[in-house]
Regions:
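Catalytic cores of RNA-modifying enzymes
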Residues: 1-94
Length: 94
């Protein structure tokens, strides 16, 4: 079991119904989506179901990054970065 790191402000979403409600309110189809700090991937799972053009996942925590790699590496439209969100170059998506 992963314990949230309070130093990183981590809180894990556990209820898939809440994740689904969040994603249902957003137009994701054929959009480039950047998800910062996805934690264990509950919202990520719902984003992927909505078929984004590309999903960019940015996770600073090394353990969560490894978990996300295992879950999503084989999905063609998903890129996963182990980096602080402040250091990511967002200008490539303009």
């Amino acid at each position: 079991m992963l314990i949230p790191k309070k130093s990183l402000g981590q809180n894990y979403l556990l209820d898939r119904n809440i994740a689904k409600k969040i994603i249902d309110s957003i137009n994701i189809l054929n959009q480039t989506i950047i998800e910062i700090g996805p934690g264990t991937g509950k919202i990520t799972d719902e984003i992927i179901k909505e078929v984004p053009k590309k999903l960019i996942i940015i996770e600073k925590d090394n353990k969560l990054y490894e978990l996300l790699l295992k879950k999503y590496t084989n999905i063609n439209n998903v890129e996963i970065f182990n980096i602080d969100a402040f250091d990511y170059d967002y200008s490539v998506h303009k």
